[in-house]
Amino acid sequence: CDRRFSRSDELTRHIRIHTGQKPFQCRICMRNFSRSDHLTTHIRTHTGEKPFACDICGRKFARSDERKRHTKIHLRQKDKKVEKAASVSTTSSPVAAYSSSVATSYSSSIATTYPSPVRTVYSSPASSSYPSPAHTAFPSPSIATTYPSGTATFQTQVATSFPSPAVTNNFSSQVTSALSDMTSTFSPRTIEIC
């Protein structure tokens, strides 16, 4: 093949792929390997040696990739605890319901950080997050505060927009009653949208 290598040992290892040469043999079961590190890992299956220990629970593994895969189990457990704690705290605070995702890092001797996106929780559509007219702690602009006379302003806009008196009369009477109904039924934010 046309592959090039900067080191001769890499070239030698690669050539073994093409030739099928396996110069490293296990003395216990006579199995052959193309790389010495694969033989070393294989011998651990016979000796029971497990040099890689989990930093969290202490479980030991023969290969480092097995420990790395095992460590992810602990991280998923921590992520679930963080999500559960986040969902509990967001239900008590209306501001936290719109928080962005948070990256959490877990330190270990592996020297790797694992981001943990915290699920964003939104309040259900049934309970409105907009303040109702009864709440005075959350000032929200309404038609009454934005326009001193909401119905009069709307009537004059309709009258100037539509020169026909028939159209003006139809809209002004319906709008006046609709606005008074809206003011008593909906929150200020809903009136603004309408």
Swiss-Prot record:
InterPro entries per record: EGR1_C (IPR021839), Znf_C2H2_sf (IPR036236), Znf_C2H2_type (IPR013087)
Region span, Disordered: 66-88
Top-rank lineage group of the source organism: Eukaryota
Zn-finger segments (C2H2-type): 1-18, 24-46, 52-74
GO function terms (MF aspect): DNA binding; DNA-binding transcription factor activity; DNA-binding transcription factor activity, RNA polymerase II-specific; double-stranded methylated DNA binding; hemi-methylated DNA-binding; histone acetyltransferase binding; promoter-specific chromatin binding; RNA polymerase II cis-regulatory region sequence-specific DNA binding
PROSITE patterns per record: ZINC_FINGER_C2H2_1 (PS00028), ZINC_FINGER_C2H2_2 (PS50157)
Protein task: Transcriptional regulator. Recognizes and binds to the DNA sequence 5'-GCG(T/G)GGGCG-3'(EGR-site) in the promoter region of target genes. Binds double-stranded target DNA, irrespective of the cytosine methylation status. Regulates the transcription of numerous target genes, and thereby plays an important role in regulating the response to growth factors, DNA damage, and ischemia. Plays a role in the regulation of cell survival, proliferation and cell death. Mediates responses to ischemia and hypoxia; regulates the expression of proteins that are involved in inflammatory processes.
Site residues (Interaction with DNA), renumbered to this chain: 3, 7, 13, 31, 35, 59, 63, 69
Protein name: Early growth response protein 1
One Gene Ontology CC term in the entry: cytoplasm
Domains as described in the record: Binds to DNA motifs with the sequence 5'-GCG(T/G)GGGCG-3' via its C2H2-type zinc fingers. The first, most N-terminal zinc finger binds to the 3'-GCG motif, the middle zinc finger interacts with the central TGG motif, and the C-terminal zinc finger binds to the 5'-GCG motif. Binds double-stranded target DNA, irrespective of the cytosine methylation status. Has reduced affinity for target DNA where the cytosines have been oxidized to 5-hydroxymethylcytosine. Does not bind target DNA where the cytosines have been oxidized to 5-formylcytosine or 5-carboxylcytosine.
Compositionally biased spans, kind Basic residues: 69-79
GO biological process: cellular response to interleukin-8; circadian regulation of gene expression; interleukin-1-mediated signaling pathway; positive regulation of DNA-templated transcription; positive regulation of transcription by RNA polymerase II; regulation of protein sumoylation; transcription by RNA polymerase II
Keywords recorded for this protein, A-Z: Activator, Biological rhythms, Cytoplasm, DNA-binding, Metal-binding, Nucleus, Repeat, Transcription, Transcription regulation, Zinc, Zinc-finger
Family: Belongs to the EGR C2H2-type zinc-finger protein family.
Entry's localization field: Nucleus; Cytoplasm
